UniProtKB/Swiss-Prot annotation:
It comes from Mus musculus (Mouse). Residues 80-170 form the CTCK domain. This is Sclerostin. Keywords: Disulfide bond, Extracellular matrix, Glycoprotein, Heparin-binding, Secreted, Signal, Wnt signaling pathway. Its main location: secreted.
Amino acid sequence: MQPSLAPCLICLLVHAAFCAVEGQGWQAFRNDATEVIPGLGEYPEPPPENNQTMNRAENGGRPPHHPYDAKDVSEYSCRELHYTRFLTDGPCRSAKPVTELVCSGQCGPARLLPNAIGRVKWWRPNGPDFRCIPDRYRAQRVQLLCPGGAAPRSRKVRLVASCKCKRLTRFHNQSELKDFGPETARPQKGRKPRPGARGAKANQAELENAY
């Protein structure tokens, strides 16, 4: 009985395949040795990302591609506050309320104030202070109604139209540069000093030298 040649051929082919794989190395096997890719090389691993750029707590809530430089110029401006009130002049009162602009408080960052006006440049975060003060005024004529059947009157008022940020340095707050003492009386022209005052000064000098 002659053995079949098919199993022998299969064994020879498997043996030849294993010999070829051993010559190329075991790195050619992929997917748990179920697929042979002889031309596939090793890919380099990507470098690990820096977690500090992704941490928004360290970047002040800003995206990592928009770094904030403390030396950059940032805008400061006043907050726009409108105040509506009635004008009075004695017993008379305006027929309609008047809306005016109120400038008060410190200047804040313009990016945080959507309705900001009067923008200026702020060069240093720890630099001089800025205050919001009136910049321009507008004149408006208001009609006043008086009680008792009196004829209405008109009055011209001055209202704030815009505000601005004024720079206040440390020089404005130095109290030693200000003279809080009594103002010296200026000598008046055409008048002679009184003799009584001159005698009082002379007597005071004699009393001081007596001891």
